[in-house]
């Protein structure tokens, strides 16, 4: 029934997602998602739906934000455009870049308030599942720390700063479904080049490579594996250094100049539209390759349940309970935990 409603001319999916992220506390995100199916049958890597979403969020520690985004396909699925805008105010704890014993038990409280947007276009190479892309990202960010100047562990930062840069990318995508894939591969290499000539206060570069594989093991048993790494070079602001994003790891808790992580997931569709999920991951963050002894590492794992709320679109929704050495977290999932447009 939900799939049929989404297929209507003005069909939309109301979104109400509880937030249980350890870094910001309990809260909720609300919004509307408009989906339109392409003409004809979708096949692996082709026939993606257009998606428009608008929403907002708030949490118990005073963090809040609003966002709008649109993913659209043109010229018989040869061109994909992505446009997004957000304004947020997030109250977070700074634990250092890499391992910093001074901040392990006494992190520094700060507020991060970015306002910005991104535009991106990806062009399909021939009739293949390879895409070449180019984007531009810009944001104005205000940073305030509760700690006074000279506090041990306080990072170098500018209260008000701008970042602007080009983000070329190369993507290979054969997933059979955008929301909850059963099979296929997603690999993307993304480079960010930020420079004063492009609107940035600082000159730095950021590189990220992510690979995701989905494999059906049996008719009702599906395996997924995600591995990715990221690195920054130059004078990147501390809040743009990469961080571990495993389920169970608080947002921006494990940061470094370089980050690598891997996560595996097994989903068993045991009855009708219901599934059980188990997952485990490992991540590492460090400052540079010459000081690997300062590496922060984390092992996570957990389990969850899913229900297929829109069969035509392959949208599964559910809840995950994740465990880490110093934390237990609950996540509400709409689609894959590793969703990529």
Give the location of each predicted region.
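A short pocket-lining beta-strand/turn micro-motif at the edge of beta-sheets
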Residues: 260, 272-278, 297-301, 311-317, ...
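Short, well-ordered amphipathic alpha-helices
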Residues: 30-37, 68-70, 168-174, 209-213, ...
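Gram-negative/organellar outer-membrane beta-barrel architecture
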Residues: 4-12, 20-162, 256-259, 315-316, ...
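C-terminal soluble interaction/assembly domains
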Residues: 287-288, 293-296, 307-309
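C-terminal outer-membrane beta-barrel translocator/porin domains of Gram-negative envelope proteins
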Residues: 155-159, 163-288, 337
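Small/polar glycine-rich anion-binding or flexible loop at a beta-alpha turn
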Residues: 280-284, 294-300, 321-323
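Membrane-embedded beta-strand positions of outer-membrane beta-barrel proteins
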Residues: 14-16, 52-56, 81-85, 132-136, ...
């Amino acid at each position: 029934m939900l799939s049929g409603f989404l297929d209507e001319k003005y069909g939309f999916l109301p979104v109400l997602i509880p937030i249980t992220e350890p870094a910001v506390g309990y809260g909720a995100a609300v919004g509307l998602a408009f989906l339109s199916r392409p003409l004809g049958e979708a096949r692996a890597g082709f026939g993606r739906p257009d998606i428009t979403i608008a929403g907002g969020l708030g949490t118990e520690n005073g963090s809040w934000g609003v966002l709008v985004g649109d993913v659209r396909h043109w010229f018989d699925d040869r061109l994909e455009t992505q446009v997004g805008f957000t304004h947020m105010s997030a109250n977070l704890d700074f634990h250092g870049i890499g391992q910093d014993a001074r901040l392990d038990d006494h992190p520094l409280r700060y507020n991060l308030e970015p306002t910005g947007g991104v535009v991106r276009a990806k062009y399909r190479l021939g009739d293949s599942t390879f895409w070449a892309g180019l984007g531009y990202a810009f944001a104005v960010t205000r940073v305030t720390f509760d700690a006074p100047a000279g506090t041990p562990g306080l990072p170098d930062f500018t209260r008000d700063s701008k970042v602007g840069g080009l983000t070329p990318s190369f993507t290979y995508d054969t997933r059979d479904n955008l929301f909850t894939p059963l099979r296929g591969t997603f690999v993307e290499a993304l480079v960010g080049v930020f420079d004063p000539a492009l609107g940035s206060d600082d000159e730095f570069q950021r590189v990220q490579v992510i690979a995701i594989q989905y494999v059906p093991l049996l008719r009702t048993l599906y395996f997924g594996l995600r591995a990715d790494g990221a690195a920054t070079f130059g004078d990147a602001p501390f809040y743009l250094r990469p961080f571990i994003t495993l389920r169970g790891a608080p947002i921006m808790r494990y940061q470094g100049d370089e980050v690598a992580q891997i996560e595996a997931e097994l989903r068993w569709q045991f009855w009708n539209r219901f599934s059980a999920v188990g997952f485990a991951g490992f991540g590492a963050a460090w400052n540079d390759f010459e000081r690997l002894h300062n590496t922060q590492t984390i092992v996570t794992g957990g389990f969850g349940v899913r229900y297929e709320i829109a069969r035509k679109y392959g949208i599964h929704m559910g809840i995950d309970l994740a465990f880490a050495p110093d934390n237990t977290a609950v996540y509400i999932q709409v689609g894959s935990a590793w969703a990529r447009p």
